[in-house]
């Protein structure tokens, strides 16, 4: 039996990964992390979606220690989430240092426990917010370290790594789940479900990608299929 673990936040990217994983694997487990995030409404959304979409199991882990150690606008109410700024440079204050290091490590331990061959994460280096732990070189380096550290060939999969946001919308549509992703996921840094607040960087990337896809769906879908080998 092919089994995978999806690092699942209930947002657009991880939900799209879950939708695809359910087609590719016989048994799919979700793992969600509660680190006291500002947008922790995502945890309830993730639980609802994992059940709705048909995941075999869903584990929610308390990793409150991350909140104590990592200073970010997503872990401190006293730090405001900035509005989207096309001219912003550097790493934004929404970056949570060590988050993906911790999440992927714990997901790998869980994969070891349940006998999964893959850990799937929705990180992306094409349309992203500049987080260093979303880069392909980081994911590959950590994957190598995990394999060495647990002596188990657990594979990290990043199906969205080289897709832009329009192509990510196309992928959800390919599996006939675009409305599920649009109306039932939570991507917004301010914790607003669906189309979100419309002001933060996460909402901007999501809305811009949807607009691009809706403007020329056929071209975007063709690009997606060519990139990932879909028919």
Swiss-Prot record:
Assigned EC number: 6.3.4.20
Pathway(s) served: Purine metabolism; 7-cyano-7-deazaguanine biosynthesis
GO biological-process terms attached to the record: queuosine biosynthetic process
Free-text remark on how the cofactor is bound: Binds 1 zinc ion per subunit.
Catalytic activity: 7-carboxy-7-deazaguanine + NH4(+) + ATP = 7-cyano-7-deazaguanine + ADP + phosphate + H2O + H(+)
Positions bound to ATP: 8-18
Task of the protein: Catalyzes the ATP-dependent conversion of 7-carboxy-7-deazaguanine (CDG) to 7-cyano-7-deazaguanine (preQ(0)).
Name this polypeptide is given: 7-cyano-7-deazaguanine synthase
Organism in which the protein naturally occurs: Pectobacterium atrosepticum (strain SCRI 1043 / ATCC BAA-672)
Classification lineage: Bacteria, Pseudomonadati, Pseudomonadota, Gammaproteobacteria, Enterobacterales
């Amino acid at each position: 039996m092919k089994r995978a673990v999806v690092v699942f936040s209930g947002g657009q990217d991880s939900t799209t990964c879950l939708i695809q994983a359910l087609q590719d694997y016989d048994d799919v487990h979700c793992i969600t992390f509660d680190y006291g995030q500002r947008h922790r409404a995502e945890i309830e959304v993730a639980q609802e979606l994992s059940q709705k979409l048909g995941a075999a199991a869903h584990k929610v882990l308390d990793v409150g220690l991350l909140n104590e150690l990592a200073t970010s606008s997503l872990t401190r109410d006293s730090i405001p989430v900035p509005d989207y700024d096309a001219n912003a440079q550097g790493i934004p204050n929404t970056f949570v240092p060590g988050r993906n290091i911790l999440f992927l490590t714990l997901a790998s331990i869980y994969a070891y426990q349940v006998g999964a061959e893959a850990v799937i994460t929705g990180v992306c280096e094409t349309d992203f917010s500049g987080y260093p732990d979303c880069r392909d070189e980081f994911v590959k380096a950590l994957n190598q370290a995990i394999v060495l550290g647990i002596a188990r060939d657990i594979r990290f999969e990043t199906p969205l790594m080289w897709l832009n946001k329009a192509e990510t919308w196309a992928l959800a549509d390919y599996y006939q789940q675009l409305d599920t992703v649009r109306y039932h996921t939570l991507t917004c840094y301010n914790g607003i479900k669906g189309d979100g607040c419309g002001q933060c960087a996460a909402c901007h990337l999501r809305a811009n990608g949807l607009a691009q896809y809706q403007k020329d769906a056929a071209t975007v879908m063709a690009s997606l299929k060519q990139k990932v080998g879909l028919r």
